[in-house]
Structure formats: C-alpha cells, structure tokens
C-alpha cells in the first residue's frame, strides 16, 4: 500500500489550495464586514 507517499503528495499540494481558499474566504468575509459597517454608518 502506497498510501503514505500519495498522502504526502496530496497534502503538500492540498495545503496550498486550502490556504488560498481560506485566504479568499477571509478576504470576502472582511469585505462583507466592512460593507455592513459602512451601511450602518
């Protein structure tokens, strides 16, 4: 079973994708919060 090797490959590539997704989500959430704050004012 070569699960260890494939897992390493997936994790190294997957980590980058996950980080990018989290960054995008954080950015969108921040924009939404800023918009809400601006609308309140």
Swiss-Prot record:
Tissue: Mostly expressed in leaves and, to a lower extent, in roots, flowers and stems.
Membrane topology: Single-pass membrane protein
Any one GO cellular component localisation term in the record: plasma membrane
Keyword Ribonucleoprotein in record: no
Keywords, in A-Z order: Cell membrane, Developmental protein, Membrane, Transmembrane, Transmembrane helix
Annotated TM spans: 10-29
Required for DVL/RTFL small polypeptide activity: annotated span: 10-41
Protein name, UniProt field: Small polypeptide DEVIL 4
Annotated function: Small polypeptide acting as a regulatory molecule which coordinates cellular responses required for differentiation, growth and development, including leaves shape, pedicule elongation, inflorescence organization and fruit maturation, probably by restricting polar cell proliferation in lateral organs and coordinating socket cell recruitment and differentiation at trichome sites.
Keyword match Transit peptide: no
Family membership noted in the UniProt record: Belongs to the DVL/RTFL small polypeptides family.
InterPro entries documented for this protein: DVL, DVL/RTFL_small_peptides
């Amino acid at each position: 079973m070569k699960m260890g090797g494939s897992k390493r490959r997936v994790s190294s590539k997957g980590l980058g994708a996950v980080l990018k997704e989290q960054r995008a989500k954080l950015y969108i959430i921040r924009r939404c919060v800023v918009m809400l704050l601006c609308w309140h004012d």
